[in-house]
């Protein structure tokens, strides 16, 4: 979805000689030749907005919407808004179901994504184990693509509801749930890391990151955390 949206943007960028009204707009970039627009790509960009607007789920969801609307539509957007709100709320709330309901409060109640999350809360009451939960999910969404936002974020919700708030367990549940495992495990790991800040995870990891971003050849998790905290403080100051 992101690649196609960027291609769409470049195709209509005003640096080219184009007719009046030909500009690159979100309505065009997210839709034109983009069948991936309700997949999980926007949701996995949500983390930073939750960190930057820590403790303010409404603002986190707003940032997420602004980000997602260029590349995704409908449930692809709502998934990012939901995740950003949950991450933001996790700095102030630890109860999994309350976090999920906070996330739901930031998206349209009648969208398919919200319906799926509410269904997940119901399945938790009916299914004693995560395996039984997954049986219900697989049956309900057996014809949905394995990279769609709806079914994958239900796995994140499952890991949050059935996990024990440790990164190892919650990430393992997300991976065992299948589908887009690198995305779901990263999202639940992000949420769980906030809920369990004393996990000492950094002690077991190499702090060096070598990203593929232009201008960022080598960085560290510590440096990224410090930069993120600086953004949060700036946003908090501006919001006063």
Residue ranges and their predicted role:
Residues 1-240:
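Structured, active/binding-site neighborhoods that engage oxygen-rich ligands
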């Amino acid at each position: 979805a992101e690649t196609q949206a960027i291609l769409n943007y470049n195709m209509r960028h005003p640096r080219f000689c184009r007719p009046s009204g030909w500009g690159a707009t979100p309505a065009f970039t997210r839709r034109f030749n983009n069948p991936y627009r309700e997949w999980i790509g926007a949701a996995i960009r949500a983390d930073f907005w939750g960190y930057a607007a820590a403790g303010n789920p409404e603002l986190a969801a707003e940032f997420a919407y602004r980000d997602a609307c260029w590349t995704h539509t409908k449930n692809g957007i709502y998934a990012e808004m939901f995740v950003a709100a949950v991450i933001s709320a996790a700095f102030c709330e630890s109860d999994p179901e309350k976090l999920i309901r906070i996330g739901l409060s930031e998206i349209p109640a009648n969208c398919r994504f919200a319906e799926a999350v509410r269904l997940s809360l119901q399945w938790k009451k009916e299914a004693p184990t995560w395996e039984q939960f997954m049986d219900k999910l697989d049956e309900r969404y057996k014809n949905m693509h394995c990279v769609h936002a709806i079914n994958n974020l239900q796995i994140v919700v499952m890991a949050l509801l059935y996990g024990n708030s440790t990164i190892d367990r919650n990430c393992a549940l997300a991976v065992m749930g299948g589908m887009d495992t690198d995305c779901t495990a990263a999202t639940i790991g992000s949420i769980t890391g906030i809920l369990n800040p004393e996990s000492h995870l950094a002690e077991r990891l190499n702090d060096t990151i070598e990203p593929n971003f232009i201008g960022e050849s080598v960085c560290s998790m510590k440096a990224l955390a410090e930069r993120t905290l600086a953004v949060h403080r700036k946003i908090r100051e501006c919001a006063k």
